[in-house]
Structure formats: structure tokens, C-alpha cells
From Swiss-Prot:
Keywords: Ribonucleoprotein, Ribosomal protein
UniProt protein name: Large ribosomal subunit protein bL32
Single Gene Ontology BP annotation: translation
Region (Disordered): 1-38
The organism's place on the tree of life at top rank: Bacteria
Record flagged with keyword Hydrolase: no
InterPro entries tied to this protein: Ribosomal_bL32 (IPR002677), Ribosomal_bL32_bact (IPR044957), Ribosomal_zn-bd (IPR011332)
Pfam families listed in its UniProt record: Ribosomal_L32p (PF01783)
Length: 57
């Protein structure tokens, strides 16, 4: 089993964790038909995708 030789510093710990932060969703699209905002390449809550109804409830 590997055992560290020296204690990692706060700086090294911070550098390792620098990519762990969550980013805000910035790329929201507007549906052509309903005008509703949605994630890119996802359907809207109404069931529309690229202006067409793809899911019926």
C-alpha cells in the first residue's frame, strides 16, 4: 500500500481541487414554438424539441 512521504501542503490541495468547482449553466436555448428556455439538445418541459412535439402526455 502506498504511503505518502510528506504531508501535502494547503497549496497543493487547492491546486488539485481547482477543477472541482461547479459552473453555472450558461448555454440555454429558446424553443422555436413555445418560446420556453431549455438545455441544448434536450426537450422542453412541454415535450417540444426543435419546434416539434415529440412527447405526448
Amino acid at each position: 500500500m502506498a504511503v505518502q512521504q510528506n504531508k501535502p501542503t494547503r497549496s497543493k490541495r487547492g491546486m488539485r481541487r481547482s477543477h472541482d468547482a461547479l459552473t453555472a449553466v450558461t448555454s440555454l436555448s429558446v424553443d422555436q414554438t413555445s418560446g420556453e428556455k431549455h438545455l441544448r439538445h434536450h426537450i422542453t418541459a412541454d415535450g417540444f424539441y426543435r419546434g416539434r412535439k415529440v412527447i405526448t402526455k
